[in-house]
């Protein structure tokens, strides 16, 4: 049901409820009507729309719910505005109201899609509001791994979903460039520069073993220049003993590499925020001082503790260790203060489920500052791990990273690059990258974030209905082919189809497809509200299934103009919604496959 029709029907039902309540209790009686909730019945035979308002009213009105439902239906169908929407009404069970929509109401979605085009499904209901969405936020110590890939897909798609509701979305990447791991990166690069490799005597125990470290060391010694998208160029000094210069070069090198990973994945950020800036600008110290002054801390065993139990944590947490260094959640608190100070009253963080323990600590620290930040700030979407399978075996290692599969590996393998070909990236063409990006983005968004995901490379390469991204893209390509044939055989252009006689669309398959199209706007609204980007992938698979059912049941390219153009109009609307949904996922909508 289209949102406009839903709003109209909700208003008509609310008015009907008021009429019935006044008839039973008197116009002056105090009465608070419940919110009208409309749902699509799980069983198609029960109608198009179901409402349980009669059962909600039974107790406050002291009436039998089934009899109430009958009165509400009578009041509803008596309203002229309802006659264009409601074809029939039935009472089921203890008092459910099941409504059947008119054919015209179901067909209206086609005109709406033609009229709105790429904007179909979007809303401006949240126009003027802004959201900061933080995701990926990897340490600049290596290539992005598949966990970062899942986070990138979740974050980018959720940003698109939220933006579809009118929000101004600010995408932010927080670089953890101030921790112990950065020191390990520096000594790893230094060891490689000295000619050592993993397993050699003198190889640092905490060093990173991936081949990318050798690449960094080579470019550092060759005095190459590298730069992240938002950073100043850094030139390798070539001095093996200058660990600080090595660190700066290695961080810049890997930030650039991560930029390339994100570019291949089709993800862009509005801002990169450096953890190191929190220290250089004194924000960490300022935050700690404020918590001390607020009485939220105490000292014990030489350490500074935060009273996180005051804010619901299971135990108090160490903020500053006895050696004077801060625990990892302290700069996180300072960082979130900057989000609040920048005017972002709604913030969403997408992180791995291993960060679950930091949620209470960060929120407790923010509450302890007493600067007006609401409880529950920020929101979190936590995702579980990704396992990569190929040839029935788990893939754990990568030549690039040494100990994990990278996002770039996954994109290239899923696009059809042969194992080992990643060593010669110049041989991998753009078409391979596009296929791989489409598959990886769709697959990684196709499950709820809180479920573990098995990424099957072999499935991503299949060109049949088993592969979900192929299944959806093929539906789009098939429609393009039919509409091209319509033009060549009958000289009918898509621009002519809005004038088609949609009364021809009476088959169960056509009606079901139209109903699925009409669900798209509400699906986006729900996905944004529930922070559930996977809903878009679920919907597109269902829509592709409805299309295939319709296409297999009805011939489109027939000589009879009326049914031909009506069916073609339905296909054109379906193509547009498929294209819109794939755009939200950041997946291409090919015209040929």
Swiss-Prot record:
Q: Give the main localization category.
A: cytoplasm
Q: Where in the cell is it found?
A: Cytoplasm
A GO BP entry: arginyl-tRNA aminoacylation
**GO MF annotation, one:** arginine-tRNA ligase activity
Membrane-crossing residue ranges in chain numbering = none
Q: Does the keyword Cell membrane apply?
A: no
Motif 'HIGH' region per record, residues = 138-148
Write down the superkingdom of origin: Bacteria
What are the alphabetically sorted keywords of the record? Aminoacyl-tRNA synthetase, ATP-binding, Cytoplasm, Ligase, Nucleotide-binding, Protein biosynthesis
Q: Please list the disulfide bridges.
A: none
Q: What is its EC number?
A: 6.1.1.19
Per UniProt, the enzyme's principal EC class comes to ligase
Q: Which Gene3D superfamilies match?
A: Arginyl tRNA synthetase N-terminal domain, HUPs, Isoleucyl-tRNA Synthetase, Domain 1
Reaction(s) catalyzed by this protein? tRNA(Arg) + L-arginine + ATP = L-arginyl-tRNA(Arg) + AMP + diphosphate
A single Gene Ontology CC annotation of this entry is: cytoplasm
This protein's assembly is summarised as: Monomer.
Query: To which protein family does this belong?
Result: Belongs to the class-I aminoacyl-tRNA synthetase family.
Cross-referenced NCBIfam families, in alphabetical order?
A: argS
Protein name from the UniProt record: Arginine--tRNA ligase
Name of the gene: argS
